[in-house]
From Swiss-Prot:
UniProtKB keywords: Endoplasmic reticulum, Lipid droplet, Membrane, Transmembrane, Transmembrane helix
Induction profile: In liver with hepatic adiposis caused by PPAR gamma 1 overexpression. Up-regulated during adipogenesis.
InterPro entries: LDAF1
Location(s), subcellular: Endoplasmic reticulum membrane; Lipid droplet
Coiled coil region boundaries: none
Origin organism lineage: Eukaryota, Metazoa, Chordata, Craniata, Vertebrata
Subunit field text: Interacts with BSCL2/seipin to form an oligomeric complex.
Protein's recorded name: Lipid droplet assembly factor 1
Protein family according to the UniProt entry: Belongs to the LDAF1 family.
Organism: Mus musculus (Mouse)
Ranges per topology, Cytoplasmic: 1-43, 88-93, 134-161
Residues that span the membrane, as ranges: 44-61, 68-87, 94-110, 117-133
Topological type in the membrane: Multi-pass membrane protein
Alphabetical GO biological process terms: lipid droplet formation
Recorded GO CC terms: endoplasmic reticulum membrane; lipid droplet
Amino acid sequence: MAKEEPPSVSRDLQELQRKLGLLLESFLNNSKVVAFMKSPVGRFLDRHPFVTLTVLMFVTMSAIPVGFFLLIVVLTSLGALMGAILLEGLVISVCGLSLLCVLCGLGFLSLALSGIAMMSYVVVSCLMSYWFSPSRPLTQQNANVDCQLAMKFTESERLIF
């Protein structure tokens, strides 16, 4: 039985060698490979098989680290994109709350200024109607006396209440 296995193994190896030869021939007859082999880089690699093997091994072994690096770059970019979106949302929220506070403050300030303006209008119109009433003519001296009396009257009211 030991003598029967070697002819079978040798036939299998010959078949494998023939298939690899056909594969190599079809590979070398490919138009893109022919164009590459006619280029200066292809001619250099054809004349220097050790360099060709070294480059082939380097490219093969560097595929996994380059793949991991590209994966990390993509994941970091996605993380940065999400971080920028979250940061943008945070900035918009903080600015929105700041704007709300400023607008509320301006609303209260406008209410206070409107109240002061309305009270000033009422006081000035009452004083104008009192000073310049058609029923009694006032002189400058009488107006000053009336203002002083009004001031004393309001001070006495403050003391009473």
